Amino acid sequence: MLDKLTTELRNEKTMNLDEMNTIEILTAMNEEDHRVPQQIAQALPAIAPLVEETIKAMKQGGRLIYVGAGTSGRLGVLDAAECPPTFGVAPDRVIGLIAGGEKAFIEAKEGAEDDEGLGEADLKKIQLTVRDVVVGIAASGRTPYVIGALKYANQVGAVTGSLACNRGAAISRIATYPIEVETGSEVLTGSTRLKAGTAQKLVLNMISTTVMIGLGKAYKNLMVDLKPTNEKLRERSKRIIMEATDVEAAVAEKHLREAGGVVKVAIITILTGCSVDQAQMTLDRNGGFIRKAVHELN
């Protein structure tokens, strides 16, 4: 089976990898990495409908759930973990499941990915519903853990998407919204943490970021729903308010403090002159979109 996967083929350009010097190895890797964005560009028409369905689902209270094993699982967990601080969503709105559980994130758990039943069981643990979106991630496109999860998600009636790095992947036949980014042979044969992993990371960035923009988490190109939980983020929050409203630092800081640290509310109060309570109510009424709230108040 593996010999039919392009991700497992030997790369003809690196047959003498062990004889290359440092700069030659780095050059070979860099040249191969350049192929990844080109392949993703071809997959954009497949990525878009999954994003749009995810926006619809999350507006109705659904969750985005990534499922994967090994590198694929770790990338899903990583993308999910970045959403709360970046976009201000609750940790249970974007979830990453990895075969073998949390410990498998830092230490490989042998055999976990080979059990379809574990994929189903992990989704049952988080009480998957018809409102959710499940995205199965597998470079090979044939990981049993992911297949089991997608099959169960289909049974429940959840939206299903998949991300594979081989054409004609098994998970593509199961998911309603399949994405295939054919990254080809790796510099180091079969090491899919390289180009395949890079492609997966870029696509997951696209999915989560575009979904969050569709949920009102951006104003212009500013990250307005971040949570200022440390000094760096507090400074970033202040700078975002300054950029959005063209005010001085002291004014931004004052409005941020009065808004209880809620960047969106601070921006609306500055742009419209309304009270904090009025800004929050109008923002809520407009689904969290600053632009719509400001338009209503003005």
Swiss-Prot record:
Its EC number is 4.2.1.126. Pathway: Amino-sugar metabolism; N-acetylmuramate degradation. Residues 54-217 form the SIS domain. It catalyses: N-acetyl-D-muramate 6-phosphate + H2O = N-acetyl-D-glucosamine 6-phosphate + (R)-lactate. It is an enzyme of class 4 (lyase). Homodimer. Belongs to the GCKR-like family. MurNAc-6-P etherase subfamily. This is N-acetylmuramic acid 6-phosphate etherase. It comes from Halalkalibacterium halodurans (strain ATCC BAA-125 / DSM 18197 / FERM 7344 / JCM 9153 / C-125). The gene is murQ.
